[in-house]
Amino acid sequence: MSNESIKAEQDLIQEGVESEVSTAEASLIDELTQANFRIEELEQLLAEALAKVEEQKDSVIRAAAEVDNIRRRAAMDVEKANKFALEKFANELLPVLDNMERALMGTNPEDEATKSIYQGVELTQKSLLTAVAKFGVKQIDPQGQSFNPDQHQAIGMQPSAEFPANTVMLVMQKGYELNSRLLRPAMVMVSQGGPNQESATIDIEA
């Protein structure tokens, strides 16, 4: 075979190889282009999915916060309702306790004719005070204590050699408080002190 024939055959082979390479390159470029398009589509779908997840997350957080607020408001409403009901009950109970107190004051525990009545009323009063104490109702009996304007209401002042100045010398009506909040002040007579004591003055409410 002549040199020209060999060269011609080599040229044909080279052209075939170049054609196949060119076709393969074109196919590869097309596949890469399609892959890039697919990647962009997937990235877009992922971004949309993440946005929806974030939106749903915010919705869940807002819903949880709203539920928590509703629970707190409901608990506060229940607490207020219970407090109002308990305060109303306690105020309605005060006349009953006052009547028991007056019954004890009007009965002589040393008199055999009224001794059993006194003991019965006293026992009932103690039982009632013990029962209401469980709900926060406490009696204010400041006999012999220093006058406290936050808990006591003075109806008058009198000189006294027995009680120091500004001391409760007589409780006219006992007071009551509910969970440390004043329901009714104790009505008291306050000592001005004796001749050898420094006299005291306080504001007396009508």
From Swiss-Prot:
| Keyword flag Cytoplasm | yes
- What Gene3D superfamilies is this protein classified in? 3.90.20.20, Head domain of nucleotide exchange factor GrpE
Question: Pfam families under this entry?
Answer: GrpE
Which locations, inside or outside the cell, does it occupy?
Cytoplasm
GO biological-process terms attached to the record: protein folding
Query: What top-level branch of life does the organism fall under?
Result: Bacteria
Which key words tag this protein in UniProt? Chaperone, Cytoplasm, Stress response
Q: Which GO terms describe its molecular function?
A: adenyl-nucleotide exchange factor activity; protein homodimerization activity; protein-folding chaperone binding; unfolded protein binding
- Cystine links in this protein are none
* Stored InterPro entries: GrpE (IPR000740), GrpE_coiled_coil (IPR013805), GrpE_head (IPR009012)
Provide the Gene Ontology terms for cellular component: cytosol
HAMAP family found in the cross-reference section: GrpE
Q: How does it assemble?
A: Homodimer.
UniProt family annotation = Belongs to the GrpE family.
Q: What does this protein do?
A: Participates actively in the response to hyperosmotic and heat shock by preventing the aggregation of stress-denatured proteins, in association with DnaK and GrpE. It is the nucleotide exchange factor for DnaK and may function as a thermosensor. Unfolded proteins bind initially to DnaJ; upon interaction with the DnaJ-bound protein, DnaK hydrolyzes its bound ATP, resulting in the formation of a stable complex. GrpE releases ADP from DnaK; ATP binding to DnaK triggers the release of the substrate protein, thus completing the reaction cycle.
Q: What is this protein called?
A: Protein GrpE
Organism name: Shewanella baltica (strain OS155 / ATCC BAA-1091)
Could you tell me the gene encoding this protein? Answer: grpE
